[in-house]
């Protein structure tokens, strides 16, 4: 059974103690060593309390709704809507280019018959005939004249219930809204010298960029957001838009805290990240028609660039992870074209670029926190590669492209021929792009991804612009550099890595095939087979197993087993001292630890629910102690864990102890267990639900806590893989025999596989729900 991995970890905890004891003996024998740490020995220990610090961001975010602004005369910017919000009827806005266009808009309230009103427009009183037949909507009337002494004529109108109107300069024309709310149209005025056209607003107004035109239209249709209609919103002068903001420099060092020999420094840097891929193309022996491998290799690249007038020397290392293996076999003859394996990076792959430069930020990168970075995307396209055959036309692998998207940053170390460099590792996720790649003169075509054959497309490098910010704890003495071998990634960055690993792990639940999962759950997984999916794990399997057991020994499951063992020992001695007393407390306390709760058994549902919930939490331990032939929750948990480890692209050997331990505690939190007595079944779940029912008819019977307590002590505990509600649903919809019912109650894997192979939706849905509960 797959749960053998948990049993093995529980049973071998003593090896961890022995390993620790051996290490302690080794330390004791080698402790008498004289070390001369030099004049800066105190800097080996960092202060506990770090300064608060901040991460500056130079990104300018343009608001969608800018305002409100007070009535004024100004030249509105091009490609920006001026959203007018008058409160009363009358003149709303005037505008002129002082050459051949004088424009004005007046507002008329609802229910106005045709009448002549006097308006002061451009300092002159004008008689304008207006009307508004609408009973609910206000009417904006747009007027125009071409000479100062001329008369205003009607150009367009807008009926608006929220009393909002918009004007914009764009494309050599003046644009306004026309028609009626919910069916709005845009109307343009052709005007010369429109850049210098000034507007005089007689009401509050807002400014909205043209790329948010749909939002402006929504406001005119439905009104401003509620927060804009409160008394706390006060209009300001348009001159406030011209305030000069002093922003932090993008390249600077800020001392944010200083204590004794240490200081916290925030480093902000703009960077130019250049990298290139490397590859290996290996031909097979023979007549020259076969290639054995085309693969990606790590590539170092050194370059210089200018940052704020300073020449920067930078070094990058590019590597890939999660490659996809492809092959092409043209036939079995010695002269048939064959590629045994060629690597392609796709959506499931990652590209790592380790970056270092000679600035102060990388000199003392030992204790680091608040690490953040922003980088642009970059498109990587593949080039052509001709496979030189001795005779005949040469096949050519051509095309392929991926887009690199920044997906995170951590600390790393680069190793060159001469030095080791503390660096930043930028991780990029991939998306496939056009064009696809193909091999000419073969049937390989329309495949997507970037093959390893010519990933740089004859470029010297790919380039990404970006910036990063970090806070580093450095010695106050600027002449001292902390040793590189002490480099550590602080907990914040470790938690970010584990968080990303958890997200990927949980997302893999959708990719697990149920039929294969049942088969895997029946295998006797041990530590070595569990780790087989981790690259280079065979070489470090022994040390990894020890690390896993060290971590697992502190888990809740191991602690519960230890507590249970002590409880059983105490219970046995208690029974021997007082064998005449038989109660719920004496028979079940070792397994349930609820003896105090059972002293006064209540008939209320709440009391029974509390008791059964407490019992069910310990039933997992009883099941581990008395293995049955059926499949259990830990088998499914271990099988899902193994599948996700094999599929994961982010998991590494140092993550295994945390993953194994967390999975044992958190996978399938909602479990139900049952015990069978003749034709009666008692079932209790960790969420407090409980059932008692007959096997043949699934008819519910009264639930007896005392009976359950007695049965738990003497009978095997079975995982309710198919719980009572699922069984009843299955029987009601499909009908099952008594034998099938017994097999499902015993979680018989053979019967489960039969139902799954028949695509039974009820059973498949139950197993899928269990898989979805396997989350970190």
From Swiss-Prot:
Span(s) of short sequence motif DGE motif: 308-310
Region (Hydrophobic): 389-409
Motif (YGL motif): 448-450
InterPro entries tied to this protein: ConA-like_dom_sf, Rota_A_VP4, Rota_VP4_MID, Rota_VP4_MID_sf, VP4_concanavalin-like, VP4_helical
Entry keyword annotation includes Membrane: yes
Spike foot: annotated span: 510-776
Position of sequence motif KID motif: 644-646
A GO biological-process term: permeabilization of host organelle membrane involved in viral entry into host cell
Taxonomy, superkingdom: Viruses
Region (Spike body and stalk (antigen domain)): 248-479
A GO CC annotation given for this chain: host cell plasma membrane
Sequence segments annotated as region (Spike head): 65-224
Keyword set, alphabetical order: Capsid protein, Coiled coil, Disulfide bond, Hemagglutinin, Host cell membrane, Host cytoplasm, Host cytoskeleton, Host endoplasmic reticulum, Host membrane, Host-virus interaction, Membrane, Outer capsid protein, Viral attachment to host cell, Viral penetration into host cytoplasm, Viral penetration via permeabilization of host membrane, Virion, Virus entry into host cell
Coiled-coil annotated residue ranges, if any: 484-511
Site, as annotated: Cleavage: 231-232, 241-242, 247-248
Pfam families with a match to the protein in the record: Rota_VP4_MID, VP4_haemagglut, VP4_helical
SS bond list: 203-216, 318-380
Family: Belongs to the rotavirus VP4 family.
Further facts: This strain probably does not use sialic acid to attach to the host cell.
Protein name: Outer capsid protein VP4
Organism: Rotavirus A (strain RVA/Equine/United States/FI-14/1980/G3P4[12]) (RV-A)
């Amino acid at each position: 059974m797959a749960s053998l991995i948990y049993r093995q970890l529980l049973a071998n905890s003593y090896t961890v103690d022995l390993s620790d004891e051996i290490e302690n003996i080794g330390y004791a024998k080698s402790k008498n060593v004289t070390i001369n740490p030099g004049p800066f020995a105190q800097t080996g220990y960092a202060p506990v309390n770090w300064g608060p610090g901040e991460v500056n961001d130079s990104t300018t975010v343009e608001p969608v709704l800018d305002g409100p602004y007070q009535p004024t005369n100004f030249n509105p910017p091009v490609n920006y809507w001026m959203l007018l919000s008058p409160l009363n009827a009358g003149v709303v806005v005037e505008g002129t280019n002082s050459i051949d266009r004088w424009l004005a808009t007046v507002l008329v309230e609802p229910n106005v018959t045709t009448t002549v009103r006097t308006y002061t427009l451009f300092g002159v009183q004008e008689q304008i005939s207006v009307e508004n037949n609408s009973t609910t909507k206000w009417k904006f009337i747009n007027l125009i004249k071409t000479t100062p002494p001329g008369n205003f004529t009607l150009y367009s109108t807008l009926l608006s219930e929220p009393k909002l109107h918009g004007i914009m300069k764009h494309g050599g024309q003046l644009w306004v809204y026309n028609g009626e709310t919910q069916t709005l149209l845009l109307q343009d005025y052709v005007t010369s010298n429109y850049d210098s056209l000034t507007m005089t607003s007689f009401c509050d107004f807002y400014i909205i960029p043209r790329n948010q035109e749909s939002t402006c239209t929504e406001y005119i249709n439905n009104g401003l957001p509620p927060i804009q209609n409160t008394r706390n919103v006060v209009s300001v002068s348009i001159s406030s838009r011209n305030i000069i903001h002093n922003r932090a420099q993008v390249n600077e060092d800020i001392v944010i805290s200083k204590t004794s020999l240490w200081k916290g420094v925030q480093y902000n840097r703009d960077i130019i990240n250049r990298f290139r891929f490397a590859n290996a193309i290996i031909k097979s022996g023979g007549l020259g028609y076969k290639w054995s491998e085309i693969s990606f290799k790590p590539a170092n690249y050194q370059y210089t660039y200018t940052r704020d007038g300073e020449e920067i020397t930078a070094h990058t290392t590019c590597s890939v992870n999660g490659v996809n293996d492809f092959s092409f076999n043209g036939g079995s003859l010695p002269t048939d074209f064959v590629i045994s394996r060629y690597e392609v990076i796709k959506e499931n792959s990652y590209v790592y670029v380790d970056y270092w430069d000679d600035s102060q930020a990388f000199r003392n990168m030992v204790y680091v926190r608040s690490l953040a970075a922003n980088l642009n995307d970059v498109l990587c396209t593949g080039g052509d590669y001709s496979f030189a055959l001795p005779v005949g036309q040469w096949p050519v692998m051509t095309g392929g492209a991926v887009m690199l998207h920044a997906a995170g940053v951590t600390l790393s170390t680069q190793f060159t021929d001469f030095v080791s460099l503390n660096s930043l590792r930028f991780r990029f996720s991939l998306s496939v792009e056009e064009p696809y790649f193909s091999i000419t003169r073969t049937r390989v075509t329309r495949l997507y991804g970037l093959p390893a054959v010519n990933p740089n497309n004859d470029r010297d490098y790919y380039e990404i612009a970006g910036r990063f910010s970090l806070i580093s704890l450095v010695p106050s003495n600027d002449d001292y550099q902390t040793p590189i071998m002490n480099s550590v990634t602080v907990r914040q960055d470790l938690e970010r890595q584990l968080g990303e690993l958890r997200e990927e792990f949980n997302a893999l639940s959708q990719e697990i095939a149920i039929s294969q999962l049942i088969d895997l759950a029946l295998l006797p997984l041990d530590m070595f087979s569990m780790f087989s999916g981790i690259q280079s794990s065979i070489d470090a399997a022994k040390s990894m197993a020890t690390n896993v057991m060290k971590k697992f020994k502190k888990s809740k499951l191991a602690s519960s087993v230890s507590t249970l063992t002590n409880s059983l020992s105490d219970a046995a001695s208690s029974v021997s001292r007082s064998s005449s007393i038989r109660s719920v407390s004496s028979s079940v306390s070792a397994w349930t630890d609820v003896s105090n709760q059972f002293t006064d058994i209540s008939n209320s549902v709440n009391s029974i629910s509390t008791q059964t919930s407490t019992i069910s939490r310990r039933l997992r331990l009883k099941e581990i102690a008395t293995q049955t032939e059926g499949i259990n929750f830990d088998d499914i948990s271990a099988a899902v864990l193994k599948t996700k480890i094999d599929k994961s692209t982010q998991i590494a050997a140092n993550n295994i102890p945390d993953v194994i331990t967390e999975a044992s505690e958190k996978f399938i939190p909602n479990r139900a267990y049952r015990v069978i007595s003749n034709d009666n079944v008692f079932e209790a779940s960790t969420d407090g639900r409980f059932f008692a029912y007959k096997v043949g008819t699934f008819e519910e019977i009264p639930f007896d806590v005392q009976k359950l307590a007695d049965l738990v002590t003497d009978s095997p505990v079975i995982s309710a893989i198919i719980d009572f509600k699922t069984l009843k649903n299955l029987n009601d919809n499909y009908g099952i025999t008594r034998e099938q019912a017994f097999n499902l109650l015993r979680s018989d894997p053979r019967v489960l596989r039969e139902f799954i192979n028949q695509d039974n939706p009820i059973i498949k849905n139950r197993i899928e729900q269990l898989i979805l509960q396997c989350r970190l």
